[in-house]
């Protein structure tokens, strides 16, 4: 794995800690939740617990995100029914992304720092793109040239059709 930058890079010091942290979207005092207010990209698939969405802007067709229908923050906040449905659904989404072809691995990530509505990201690592292994994939996804939002949505719709 390699950074998508050339030398020389310098390590900078971390800034001061900000406590309490500022509110995120969907938290009291923060901006409205994008999902609950209808500001998120239109879902390509959904069931009683989750919806699947394409990203806006991105370089890797097949990159999708899964959100809970209920406004909760984390895995531990999901209803028992949604938590039970989550694992099998993740496996189905991974298989659907792998079926796109030319995919080495599917990375599943949850950061949660931007918004307080539970969502996870599925990122396909292109087959043979070994410099993007592990935690490097999001960095490479960010610096590679974007494809059109239409191409991202079409890939997401193909993935949804396999679910």
Question: What is the meaning of each model-derived region?
Answer:
Residues 118-125:
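A short beta-strand motif that forms the metal-chelation/ATP-contact edge
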Residues 1-66:
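Active-site microenvironments that recognize anionic phosphate/pyrophosphate groups
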Residues 79-104:
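A long amphipathic alpha-helix within ATP-dependent nucleotide-binding catalytic cores
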Residues 1-19, 126-163:
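C-terminal helix-cap and adjacent tail motif
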Residues 101-114:
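A short glycine-rich, hydrophobically flanked beta-strand micro-motif that places a catalytic Asp/Glu
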Residues 64-87, 140-148:
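Short histidine-centered catalytic/ligand-binding loop motif
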């Amino acid at each position: 794995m390699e950074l998508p930058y050339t030398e020389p890079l310098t390590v900078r010091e971390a800034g001061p800690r900000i406590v309490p942290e500022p509110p995120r979207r969907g938290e009291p005092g923060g901006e409205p939740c994008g999902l609950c207010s209808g500001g998120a990209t239109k879902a390509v698939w959904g069931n009683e617990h989750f919806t699947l969405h394409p990203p806006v802007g991105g370089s890797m067709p097949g990159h999708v995100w899964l959100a809970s229908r209920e406004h909760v923050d984390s895995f531990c906040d999901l209803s028992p029914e949604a938590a039970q449905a989550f694992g099998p659904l993740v496996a189905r989404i991974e298989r659907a992304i792998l079926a796109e072809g030319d995919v080495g691995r599917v990375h599943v990530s949850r950061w949660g720092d931007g918004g307080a509505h539970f969502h996870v990201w599925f990122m396909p690592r292109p087959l043979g793109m070994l410099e993007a292994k592990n935690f490097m994939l999001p960095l490479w996804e960010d610096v590679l040239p974007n494809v059109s939002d239409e191409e991202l949505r079409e890939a997401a719709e193909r993935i949804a059709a396999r679910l």
